[in-house]
Amino acid sequence: SGGMSTAIDELSNSYFHPLQHRSPEFATSVGLPGADQGTFSDYSPAGIAEDAELISSTLAQLDELTPVNDDDAISADALRERLGLQLELFEAGEITGEINVIASPIQEIRDIFDLMPTDTAEDWHTIARRLTSVATALDGYKESLLARVASGPAIPKRQVLRCAEQCDTLKDSASSSFHKLAETGAAVFPELADDLREGALDAQSAYGELAAFLRDEISPHATDKDAVGHERYQRFSRLFLGAAVDLDE
């Protein structure tokens, strides 16, 4: 907002600043220097509830502020739209134990490694640390899946089984992106080879355990219906399109 930082700018910063620590993946995806990228968010119900609490208090503070000019009003609207939707999804039970074959924690935890810097030994040391953190992240996620089974919304069985297949791919060294990543680093920094390979094996076995967990613990409680339903679809289309869509057109 033209050089001068407004109260709304400050609030926005006060939300995003702790986010880089609460969500190391966020720090990685926006390339924030100085944030620790060797770990993961807390994917458990408690961790997700804390995130929602931060969003909720930020929105409450936003309601107390008056934009000083047009730019400021645009900033406020953008923040309110983004955070309001996140909160709505959380309250509808959509964030806890989210599972699908494209953009759920199963893929996010895997894909974040593609965005990590790989130039220095320090970078690879961070990658090794994050590989050993995969199991903890997936344990939190399993708790959330069980919470979702207990309180809904229903989980489509087809998604569960296809996600289990994705986990199988990540488990086996022949196909695992974790294995390839470790070997790439080991070739450049032999002194980190042991840490990287150990981290990769940890991550692979964590995904192997998740595959079994999905088949044994979650699939029996999942629904054969894949339908999303009008209200849920509207929320998700807003999430991806950034606007409310008139679905009845």
Model-identified regions with their sequence ranges:
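N-terminal maturation segment of proteins
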Residues: 2-249
